[in-house]
């Protein structure tokens, strides 16, 4: 009954910590099966931090860094994290991680930023992507989501 309501968009989904761990395992498996081996796993602040850390741990300790993408009126402003410098970006491959692609524009802005600095390959991953997302992730567990999803780390936000 609840899944039918979720599929119709009538109920918000609140995955538990255990479910989120299962998502991380499934997404890490999907990425590994594709053959993509990033040099860095990047969590896009804030929703991507926890999924990126979990995936990073599951993918044999790939270096984890964060990137801050702020929404601006005319696009995305990307801030660099002090632990990743421009010199270490050139020629490297990156996995950008979000919890959910609403529009996908945040990840698109971060990807463009890394590519402009010479990144060799940049792929995106998320647990869920909304049905109206303008940009589709390279790796996703559930695409075309029509309902709200509140992850455990969002429950503490005001």
Model-derived regions: residue spans:
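PRPP-associated nucleotide enzymes
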Residues: 1-158
């Amino acid at each position: 009954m609840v899944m039918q309501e979720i599929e119709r968009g009538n109920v918000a989904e609140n995955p538990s910590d255990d479910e989120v761990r299962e998502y991380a395992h499934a997404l890490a498996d999907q990425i590994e099966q594709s053959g993509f081996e990033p040099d860095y796993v990047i969590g896009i602040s804030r929703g991507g931090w926890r999924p990126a850390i979990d995936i990073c741990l599951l993918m044999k300790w790939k270096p984890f860094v964060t990137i801050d993408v702020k929404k601006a009126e005319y696009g995305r402003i990307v801030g660099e994290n002090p632990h990743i410098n421009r010199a270490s970006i050139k020629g490297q491959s990156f996995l950008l991680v979000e919890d959910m692609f609403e529009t996908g524009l945040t990840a698109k802005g971060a990807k463009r930023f890394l590519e402009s600095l010479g990144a060799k390959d940049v792929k995106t991953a998320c647990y869920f992507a909304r049905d109206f997302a303008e940009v589709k992730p390279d790796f996703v567990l559930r695409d075309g989501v029509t309902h709200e999803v509140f992850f455990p780390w969002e429950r503490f936000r005001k």
